[in-house]
């Protein structure tokens, strides 16, 4: 019995460590930054590098993705059959493939993902 409990605890802990932060109150940036302190540090670094106000960056991310890392545009349907998406936008910023490739080329950050904050 104790081995089974230990296995269940290990499974739950390993699965919970894979989860990404999803704020439940997207209208309060202070609570979002309090829940995920790395986001504030990243926002400060972006502010320093690009000169964009933190509030503006967070407002754009809220509008584009509601702070969901894996959001994509909806798929159109034809008679209940899902069709291809009309846009390649993906992630927090909803950057399309050409814009994301331009960003990677300009910054040299080939390992960055659109779904990473």
Q: Residue locations for each model-derived region?
A:
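Bacterial N-terminal signal peptides that target proteins for export
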Residues: 1-7
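Bacterial N-terminal signal peptides
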Residues: 7-16
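Catalytic glycan-binding domains that act on GlcNAc-containing polysaccharides
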Residues: 19-117
